[in-house]
Regions:
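A short, amphipathic beta-strand motif
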Residues: 270-281, 589-599
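Hydrophobic/aromatic-rich core segments of domains that either
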Residues: 2, 116-136, 145-155, 160-253, ...
Length: 827
């Protein structure tokens, strides 16, 4: 209990000051908020003021006061009723218990509900004990599922029963904060050793931060499947919305959000320094420097800082390759520079800013090869559960999984049924509206929101074909914004004269928006979108939010509109074609690409194109474009571009190549893509894999250390009668003579003897000879081995090649053409 203590005594004056500053920016909105604060207790009002003082403008525009009231009331309740919470340093309580936002998720009131669900399970526990217990509760309510980029609210993850790692961690952080455990989400923004990223959770107890995998409970802290992976990261970061930073190395700001470097808790690190010179060779003060890793065949930022008065900037990072780009506006133009360095052997580098272009400074139309080396596996967190803890954890996780599977068995969104079943005579269009939404949208959409969009779109149904009307007029979704009502609000903002004028000249919608809606990037988080109705409510919105408002206004007026899927430029339909709102985004040039036949080209897997804009390269979104007969023609805006190609090797390293070019208005540039092949020795790893046991046919067990003790072996965990497994078995049978020589070194692992009766596996065993057959239930081992070898354990077959006892040199999972040839090369 917090008897005798004054709530937020140390920060009260600061909160009041920051709240008043926020008020001054949006006085018309805060007048209503102040009325509602007057109805709250002093403690709850102060908690609300803290939330409003440090939330992005988008939150103020998107959500009602009552949403934040839940977070404030629960925070005050915990402070009053939980002595551990009351004793927390105020900056820890404010940022990591009270605050409503975790990252870029939708916000929905959830804290009081979660506390009532979890409270009895954690009563009387320390923060450490409560964190472990809450994670078991999270596992029983949600699990991993690959979804689109829109981040669900914590409550939606709970109701849906699954989410991607960023959503699982948002859910887990909210659950932990709901019972007073200080918690935050941390991110490896991009891995260096594979094309992906990952988010997990840190909790604060005993004066330090500890980590856990969201919805992936363990019996101890500082353990997760990503322990080894995080030791190969070049960056792990957290974020804080407050302007008073509790601790840590600042690695950049995203509007009002400060990014903090947490890598030292996970990996071996060192400090590197970059010196930036201007075009005259003098120190470039205030230059923006982006530290990047090559991931999904594009340079992805992991930290963004500005140089000091000496033109220098420093960063603590991992031991591997990092790409550095810098930009600065000077003498009426943007200057740019790039370089790469291997931090394992280099401590510093120097780059010189120059204009970009054929007639200016930086320019070269030739392929340049670059090797990007991933940090080696060197985990700094080595705690392991005891055998007893491991057994208890397995049992509890099985119970959580069983509970969740029962919960989601017949799960559906009642709001969808409510919308579909309303008897109004437009049932076919109701169905089409739901169909145009994403699968994720259908799990958390609200009937009233859909009703509003249907009502105001239907008058335009007969004026165009359904394949235009449904996706580009009726469709309530534009990008990754929160789905809300906005059509009535938009129409109320416009006079009849304005409606008629904008329908005749849709491009003027953007002028209307520019006149009415301002951008305040220092008060926003770039990835948190202000909804169309939120923009109108506050009169503010980021550039992307305003683009979404353009599409929303056009659709409300019956004009088919979209954001171009390649570059998010605004477009509306005229004479059956989408045309750009801005002449600057007109596709007035093109590129003709020729690809080699021996490489399967896939965008964001082994190639990408980026356009230079304001001194910074932005990657085009071309996932839907494919080569035909090894050729592709793409419309482009005139300007400077960079093509990247990459060959990700099994050991995590990348053989990359860059090609810079400029294309003029009306020009078609011809480029032949270059792909770098690797030698066998470049592809191999030396990874120690943990001991495990497999079953023989008679029920006895054999240790993996014994199986792999003598020379090279192939361990293949097979999923019989599934195409990826069938494919590798067929490849092996096509070269049966070669594989038969190594039959005694090949180990097939299946779930049961019944698998041996399936046609393809049975035929393969007959052709290949004395292949060893062992058994496992696939419940744990494949997950551990897949993660350890840095391949996807959810994709079978899982194939590992060892060269000595418990030492993996190569692994692959899922469907991969040519695996048979690779295995023979390795043997």
């Amino acid at each position: 209990m917090a008897e005798g203590k004054i709530f937020l005594k140390e920060n009260r004056d600061r909160i009041e000051k920051k709240y008043r500053e926020q008020m001054m920016g949006l006085p018309q909105v805060f007048a209503e908020i102040d009325k509602k604060l007057a109805e709250c207790t002093d403690e709850v009002a102060l908690a609300c003021k803290y939330l409003y003082a440090f939330m992005p403008y988008s939150d103020i525009g998107n959500y009602a006061f009552e949403v934040f009231l839940d977070y404030a009331e629960n925070g005050v309740y915990l402070w009053k009723e939980n002595s551990g919470v009351a004793e927390l340093p105020e900056e820890i309580f404010l940022n990591y218990v009270l605050f409503h936002r975790v990252n870029e998720e939708e916000i929905a009131p959830c804290r009081t509900f979660f506390r009532r669900e979890i409270g009895e399970r954690t009563e009387g526990m320390s923060f450490r004990e409560a964190a472990l217990e809450v994670n078991y509760w999270c596992a029983q309510e949600a699990t991993y599922h690959c979804t689109d980029d829109r981040t669900l609210s914590a409550l939606a993850v709970y109701r849906r029963g699954n989410g991607r790692c960023g959503e699982e961690s948002v859910f887990t952080v909210n659950a932990l904060r709901s019972v007073g455990v200080p918690a935050r989400q941390v991110y490896a923004p991009k891995w260096s050793h594979c094309d992906d990223n990952h988010a997990w959770v840190e909790i604060w107890c005993d004066g330090s931060w500890y980590f856990l995998g969201a919805c992936e409970p363990e019996e101890i802290l500082n353990k997760g499947w990503f322990t080894n992976a995080s030791s190969r990261a070049m960056m792990v970061h957290s974020r804080v919305f407050d302007t008073m930073i509790p601790e840590g190395e600042v690695i950049g700001k995203d509007g009002m959000v400060t990014m903090l470097n947490e890598l030292k808790r996970y990996a071996l690190t060192k400090e590197i320094t970059v010196s930036v010179k201007d075009s005259h060779g003098k120190p470039a003060e205030g230059a923006e420097v982006s530290f990047e890793v090559l991931n999904y065949s594009e340079y992805a930022p992991i930290a963004e800082l500005k140089t000091d008065s000496l033109g220098k900037v420093s960063l603590t990072t991992g031991l591997g390759s990092i790409h550095i780009s810098a930009r600065m506006y000077a003498d009426g133009e943007w200057l740019h520079a790039e370089n790469s360095m291997d931090t394992k052997t280099e401590d510093c580098c120097e780059i010189c800013l120059m204009p970009v272009g054929k007639e200016k400074g930086i320019f070269y139309e030739e392929w340049t090869e670059i090797d990007m080396i991933a940090p080696h596996d060197a985990p700094v967190n080595k705690d392991m559960p005891t055998p007893e803890q491991k057994e208890r954890g397995s049992r509890r996780l099985a119970e959580a999984n069983a509970y969740r599977e029962q919960k989601v068995r017949n799960l559906s969104n009642p709001e969808c049924r409510k919308f579909l079943e309303k008897e109004t005579g437009d049932s076919s269009m109701r169905k089409k509206l739901l169909e145009v939404l994403t699968e994720k949208d259908r799990t958390d959409c609200i009937s009233q929101v859909l009703e509003e969009h249907l009502k105001f779109a239907l008058p335009y149904e007969k004026s165009m074909d359904a394949d235009i009307f449904v996706p580009y007029v009726l469709n309530p979704r534009v990008d990754d914004e929160v789905l809300q009502k906005y059509r009535k609000a938009i129409l109320e903002q416009l006079s009849e004269e304005e409606k008629n004028m904008l329908q005749k000249e849709p491009a003027k919608i953007w002028k209307w928006i520019e006149d009415k809606i301002i951008s305040s990037p220092e008060k926003e988080r770039s990835s948190v979108i202000t909804t169309p109705s939120g923009c109108l409510k506050t009169g503010t919105g980021s550039l992307l939010s305003k683009k979404i408002l353009f599409v929303a206004m056009a659709r409300t007026l019956g004009i088919p509109a979209r954001l171009n899927p390649h570059d998010r430029s605004m477009e509306y339909m005229k004479n059956g074609k989408f045309i750009p709102v801005s002449a600057e985004t007109e596709k007035n040039a093109s590129i003709f690409l020729k690809a080699s036949e021996d490489t399967q080209w896939k965008y964001f897997q082994n190639w990408s194109i980026a356009k230079l804009e304001a001194g910074k390269y932005s990657t085009l979104k071309l996932e839907t474009e494919n080569f035909r007969d090894q050729m592709m023609k793409l419309p482009l805006e005139a300007g400077n571009y960079r093509i990247l190609t990459s060959n990700r090797l099994p050991n995590g390293n990348i053989f990359a190549a860059e090609y810079y070019f400029e294309v003029q208005i009306g020009e078609m540039k011809r480029v032949e893509l270059a792909f770098r092949n690797a030698n066998l020795e470049d592809m191999l790893e030396n990874i120690s894999i943990p001991e495990f046991t497999l079953r023989k046919e008679d029920g006895s067990t054999v240790k993996a250390s014994e199986l792999t003790a003598d020379g090279k072996h192939i361990l293949a965990f097979l999923e019989e009668e599934k195409e990826p497994t069938e494919h590798i078995l067929n490849e092996m049978m096509e070269q049966e003579e070669a594989f038969s020589r190594y039959a005694k070194r090949i180990i097939f692992v299946v779930k049961s003897k019944k698998a041996l009766e399936t046609p393809t596996l049975s035929r393969a065993l007959g052709k290949l000879g004395n292949v060893q057959i062992l058994y496992d239930d696939f419940s744990e081992i494949i997950n551990i081995l897949g993660r350890r070898m840095y391949v996807d354990p959810d994709k079978l077959p899982l194939i590992i090649v060892t060269n000595k006892s418990l030492n993996g040199i190569y692994a692959t999972s899922g469907y991969n053409v040519g695996t048979g040839d690779m295995l023979l090369r390795l043997l």
